[in-house]
Amino acid sequence: MEEPKEITLSEIKKVSGVGPPASLVSLAQWASDRWLGTRAHFLRTATHTRIVPALPKTSASDKHKVVTQTLAEESFRRNGAVVRVAPSIDDFSFAVAAASRGRALILAPTLARAQHLYVAMKRAGFDVALHPRDWPQSAAGSITIGTRSAAWAPIPKLDAVLVLDEHEESYQQESAPTWNARDVALERARRDKAPWVITSPSPSLEALTCGAPLLTEDRRRERDGWAIFDLIDLRDRPPSAGSWCSEELARVLRKESRVVCVLNRKGRARLAYCEQCGTLARSETSGKALGLEGDELVSALDGERRPAVCDACSSRRFRRAKLGVSGVAEELELLTRRPVTEITADDEIDSVDTDLTVGTEAVLHRISAADAVAFLDFDQELLAPRYRAAEEAMALLVRASR
């Protein structure tokens, strides 16, 4: 491009900081066209929150010759592969296979997984950066590990891309534009002609139809990596404790073992019905279903209260239906005579002292290990009126199996 004669360009006196490389500027234009957003939106994600005056003198371009798991090495030799793995498989072997090729981008679904892998790679002698904390090291060419935003890590040119548990919904940006970190990472690999691998115990439809080969472990090893699942049909069984506890679950709960109960429903109970005639308790004015709290029927929507008296037969004996986390916790304490901890997404709990825990799916992120995990109403997950409810339900089983 020729310099216009009528314009005199000023000399650049100072560069305040380092920004994303030119490849990410081009990638931001591609992302804005695909997800109907602005280029500035994606460039903000790719830019460090603080001014970076200069990059450190570090490089991860030297390739490490490391012998790793056969499946991990084979997957990267394919240049692009989808690998179905068991939930209990260690991420380290795939991370080492990616890092041994040079400047690698490794995406993990949660910050805890990313930090754990970062520490393991550091101990193995790799030059690793944790995004976004180590943004300058990433821009200098270090192996970069991070969560969703790390798809925009400022690595100049990629030598390998690894996406762990690509089925996790945490890779999807919730606010518009709703971009997916997996798609961004694979586009970067395509542009840099770098081998890429995505792993998952339950690959998504996008992964299975992307045209890459599907690789799996030995069938016995894959089966051994999953927890044992018991499917209990409660339709024809008398409940041992309320409407949520089967005989099999009651036996597990009575043992001195650590049990986690998952129920994606808050509160004590959504519904109440007459124990004598089976009539559902409803508001006399609006007709809304009422729940039972002590000796009163209460609406969870507007707080309406009235005495617990059946409109049909005048009975005062009611039973709860559609119990929430609080209701199950109360009945669980009565059944086992042991303390129970409630955990929802609103609770800030770092450690749990009790062996019995009840909560929403957030409990699977707070509890690192358990002897048994019980989903008290899995039909609610399978039949939820939302897009891809079945895939999200499968993701819960994967998380629980770990």
Predicted ranges, named:
Residues 28, 145, 185, 261, ...:
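Conserved RecA-like P-loop NTPase ATPase core
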Residues 240-335:
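Cys/His-rich short segments
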Residues 112-123, 318-346:
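Short, charged N-terminal beta->alpha structural module
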Residues 377-402:
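Conserved RecA-like P-loop NTPase helicase motor core
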Residues 116, 120, 184, 210, ...:
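Alpha-helical scaffold elements adjacent to nucleotide-binding pockets in ATP/GTP-utilizing enzyme cores
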Residues 1-235, 243, 252-255, 277, ...:
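Accessory, non-ATPase domains that flank or precede helicase/AAA+ motor cores in DNA-metabolism machines
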Residues 17-21, 107, 111, 175-178, ...:
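Conserved phosphate/pyrophosphate-binding and hydrolysis machinery centered on Walker-type P-loop NTPases
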